[in-house]
Amino acid sequence: MRSGGRGRPRLRLGERGLMEPLLPPKRRLLPRVRLLPLLLALAVGSAFYTIWSGWHRRTEELPLGRELRVPLIGSLPEARLRRVVGQLDPQRLWSTYLRPLLVVRTPGSPGNLQVRKFLEATLRSLTAGWHVELDPFTASTPLGPVDFGNVVATLDPRAARHLTLACHYDSKLFPPGSTPFVGATDSAVPCALLLELAQALDLELSRAKKQAAPVTLQLLFLDGEEALKEWGPKDSLYGSRHLAQLMESIPHSPGPTRIQAIELFMLLDLLGAPNPTFYSHFPRTVRWFHRLRSIEKRLHRLNLLQSHPQEVMYFQPGEPFGSVEDDHIPFLRRGVPVLHLISTPFPAVWHTPADTEVNLHPPTVHNLCRILAVFLAEYLGL
């Protein structure tokens, strides 16, 4: 484990160096007759540099043949916003969705299978008619072969583009005899948030599906995020590595593959402790981070957030302390735009037996659910 980290190597993945700004020319007095040609030359040079730098930036950030669409979305009218927030049910989130997840659910364990079946059954019960798939596989681990299974739910698999929300549902393995670790923030709460969002927006999502909206919602519940022995490239991210590779090979119309249908990949992790702070990890998706920040401000001004004394508490400006290896990495490496919603610094209960329901902060959980619900409604035009 490295200081200040998540027990994971702090690699600056997905980042690029910034080009040095052009130095302004030294000021001097020029003959009047040469001024116009010089200004024209500077204008042409500036235009050329702007075009070149924009092209160069795109070639650094995007793999060949991949384009980044920038959807035009508007803010919800206040009445509609209040209706969306009012459809969320804090009691349902906590009792119906969160508590069944608060069990030991290490990969290959009975608890892991129990939670996987719960996720599948819950998603299949929604009236919007989600297309639910299981991605089972066996992987070699330091403990020998282990069975894993990702749950993939797509509202409308025929849609051209996907807004993908993801989290991991496995819990970290501790030595025999250790206090049971249920990973409330890591990542039972993110899983419960996704289920509550899908249920609360069920009618709106059903309507969007019937209207064949070009962008649909996709939910990924990933297995095997945690290392089974010691974090490394071959002992971590089992589910996301397998699923990203699989999605890269499955055709999707208009194509070419499922992974290229992902318009934005939002990964939720380490949520539920009091006073979380989030930072934008990737310049490519900073506009969506700013959108979440704006929604937090707006909900605060409308008195729709609890235990929220300041206008902005969660979505902070500035640089994160460092990059974190998490389930977004296999997708990021394939050119998928990533918005990483992980609390940094990590919660004090991280990877300790204290990461339980009693140490969660319900107002924070419900506030994040409201912010995400408004974000989904605006992004998808619900």
Swiss-Prot record:
Cysteine pairs bridged by disulfides in the record: 167-191
Binding-site residues, Zn(2+): 186, 226, 351
Documented EC number(s): 2.3.2.5
Keyword annotations of the record: Acyltransferase, Disulfide bond, Golgi apparatus, Membrane, Metal-binding, Transferase, Transmembrane, Transmembrane helix, Zinc
Catalysed conversion reaction: N-terminal L-glutaminyl-[peptide] = N-terminal 5-oxo-L-prolyl-[peptide] + NH4(+)
Record GO biological process: peptidyl-pyroglutamic acid biosynthetic process, using glutaminyl-peptide cyclotransferase
Transmembrane segments: 35-55
UniProt entry tagged with the keyword Membrane: yes
EC top class named in words: transferase
Active site: 225, 269
Topology term for the membrane: Single-pass type I membrane protein
Domain of life where this protein originates: Eukaryota
GO CC annotations on file: Golgi apparatus; Golgi membrane; membrane
Main location: Golgi
GO MF terms, alphabetically ordered: glutaminyl-peptide cyclotransferase activity; zinc ion binding
Compartments, record wording: Golgi apparatus membrane
Entries under SUPFAM superfamilies matching the protein: Zn-dependent exopeptidases
Family: Belongs to the glutaminyl-peptide cyclotransferase family.
PANTHER family: GLUTAMINYL-PEPTIDE CYCLOTRANSFERASE, GLUTAMINYL-PEPTIDE CYCLOTRANSFERASE-LIKE PROTEIN
UniProt function note: Responsible for the biosynthesis of pyroglutamyl peptides.
Name the record gives this protein: Glutaminyl-peptide cyclotransferase-like protein
Taxonomic classification: Eukaryota, Metazoa, Chordata, Craniata, Vertebrata
